[in-house]
Curated annotation (Swiss-Prot):
Residues 28-58 form a propeptide. One of its GO terms (cellular component) is extracellular region. Disulfide bonds join C62-C76, C66-C78, C72-C83. This is Conotoxin tx9a. Expressed by the venom duct. All different gamma-carboxyalted forms are mostly present in part 2, part 3 and part 4 of the venom duct. They are also found in part 1 (proximal part near the venom bulb) and part 5, but in lower quantity. The cysteine framework is IX (C-C-C-C-C-C). Keywords: Amidation, Cleavage on pair of basic residues, Disulfide bond, Gamma-carboxyglutamic acid, Neurotoxin, Secreted, Signal, Toxin. It comes from Conus textile (Cloth-of-gold cone).
Length: 88
């Protein structure tokens, strides 16, 4: 009984050590903001700027000028000529 308990403890320690090596925070990526002391993440924002596209084509108009997709209505995209309807 004592031998199997010792083996289980050793196995658990080995698993903790092995799994602990996978969870590593890379240095320099999370820093503390000097002004307010909050933690900040210096990695790029991975949130996509793409908008979901509906299969239903809207007949509503679009804004005329844009710099990026978020400047246009939800059913429009930003092109080199300005906002334009998706598939239209």
């Amino acid at each position: 009984m004592h031998l199997s308990l010792a083996r289980s403890a050793v196995l658990m320690l080995l698993l903790l050590f092995a799994l602990g090596n996978f969870v590593v925070v890379q240095s320099g990526q999370i820093t503390r903001d000097v002004d307010n002391g909050q933690l900040t993440d210096n990695r790029r924002n991975l949130q996509s700027k793409w908008k979901p596209v509906s299969l239903y084509m809207s007949r509503r108009g679009c804004n005329n000028s844009c710099q990026e997709h978020s400047d246009c209505e939800s059913h429009c995209i930003c092109t080199f000529r300005g906002c334009g309807a998706v598939n239209g």
